Amino acid sequence: MWVMMRLRRTGQEVYFQCYDSKEAAEMAVKVLNSVASGWEFYIR
């Protein structure tokens, strides 16, 4: 599963990292969204 990141200011999307499991991807998204202010992380 790909975790994507979107720059909030411009809406630009970037492939961030690929995870083997949905659980790992969800955990990463939760952690990343709590620490990154200018980026929004989500699962594609």
Question: What is each residue range found by the language model?
Answer:
Residues 19-42:
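A short, charged, amphipathic alpha-helix used as a generic interaction element across diverse proteins
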